[in-house]
Amino acid sequence: MSRAASVAATLPGAMPHPIEVEGLTKRFGKFVANDAVSFSVRPGETYGLLGPNGAGKTTLIRMLTTLLPPTSGSARIDGHDVVSERSAVRRAIGTVSQAQTTDENLTVRENLSVQGKMYGLSGRLLRDRIGQRLRQVGLWERRNQLTRHLSGGMRRRLEIARGVLHAPRILFLDEPTTGLDPQSRRAIWDMFGELRADAPLLSIILTTHAMEEADFLCGRVAIMDQGRILCEDSPDALKRALATGERVELETDRPIVQEDRLAIAEEGAANLRFASPTRVQFEARPGESTGRRVARLLEGAGYHIVHLSIALVTLEDVFFAHTGRALRDT
């Protein structure tokens, strides 16, 4: 939890939740894209929606940003209803979508100037705000460059600068680092820290299918699948709730037969999964040496262990525990 969110949490009634969602549902014919989704976001909090493509994350964001009317349920953004007070909601929010929204035939500065004027900024205030945001995202030196000449990572940074140019109280980030290389992705993550320092009470909703991104950026995370929120808490609390602390992966030189699979389960391996005929994954409590016991069991049965790794539980393990499948496989 961020410092601002921590302070807000100790002052009940002093700072209402800027985002409140209750039973929000969206149907397209017989298909239910979002099914009675409920949650709230505190002032200064970064709240993550983690799930695979098709989980309903983007549909939910489109409803919260007034681009799509809900079938039922309600949502209030900065105290305003997303259906009956759409103009007020739009004034309070900033958005960064998956798609590129900047004009590639304008310069970096011109793109921000157009955005600022749409929100009523002008004159010195607009010039100062453009300079501030471009420095924050590391694009000041490229302010006069045509947008079409920017790299993918730079374009994403420009999109984020546009989203926060008018100093919104709430920011929606829909898959902000999709398609970026690891170095560009980490640069975006670091940039969020700088933006957060400048606006400690800014509330952020971040959608992502990258568990590392949710773990790094979010104070709380909701695991989404098939239009529903399955669980919600801080990343650390979600991982602790598995009652396990280590993720074990083991690979043998030949397929593991059913009899030996049952023997592995009897060794206390939690959330047991056979990723392939020769590769087994499971979770275990720290210090119990379950991984090494399973390795010895298989070696005693005549298998040769070609790979054994033991790591900490991740949010992907949380997703698997709630859905029975891996996040990367969806």
Could you tell me what each predicted segment is?
Residues M191-R285:
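ABC transporter nucleotide-binding domain
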Residues G73-D81, V89:
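Conserved ABC transporter NBD signature motif
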Residues S113, K117, R124-R142:
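Conserved ABC ATPase "signature" region
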Residues L171-D174:
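Catalytic Walker B motif of ABC-type/P-loop ATPase nucleotide-binding domains
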Residues A167:
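Conserved catalytic motifs of ABC-family nucleotide-binding domains
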Residues N105, L146-G153:
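Conserved ABC ATPase signature
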